Regions:
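Short alpha-helical segments that sit at the start of domains
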Residues: 1-28
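A broad helix-preferring feature
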Residues: 12-16, 49, 58, 77
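Short amphipathic alpha-helical interaction segments
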Residues: 47-63
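A short, conserved structural fragment
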Residues: 62-71
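Minor-groove-contacting beta-hairpin "wing" of winged helix-turn-helix DNA-binding domains
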Residues: 74-80
Length: 101
């Protein structure tokens, strides 16, 4: 079972699951928030959130180590091993708390 912490929500799970599905198909690719938003809201219909919301959540997931960010100007992301471990229920809630808590 996945741990729940106050800063996480269903949008975070959907974003991580999207990246994990790509990886399970053999594609560990970097994506910016726009293609994640288009696919999650229009193609897959798993989210009803704005592109800005998806972008903010991806920044937060990267800050917490669940996504990895490259290219600081354009913001491309991919799932990390920690993100995969979260989806597999292999992390404790303490592993997901911000460093100051």
């Amino acid at each position: 079972m996945r741990p729940r912490v106050p800063w996480m929500n269903e949008t975070d799970d959907a974003i991580l699951e999207f990246f994990a599905e790509l990886e399970s198909a053999g594609f560990r690719i970097w994506l910016s928030p726009t293609p994640v938003w288009i696919n999650a809201t229009q193609n897959l219909d798993v989210l009803d959130k704005s592109r800005d919301t998806i972008s903010r959540r991806m920044v937060k997931l990267a800050e917490m180590g669940l996504l990895e960010r490259t290219d600081e100007k354009r913001g491309y992301y991919r799932i990390t091993d920690k993100g995969g471990a979260y989806l597999d229920g292999e992390l404790d809630a303490d592993d997901l708390l911000p460093p100051d808590q």
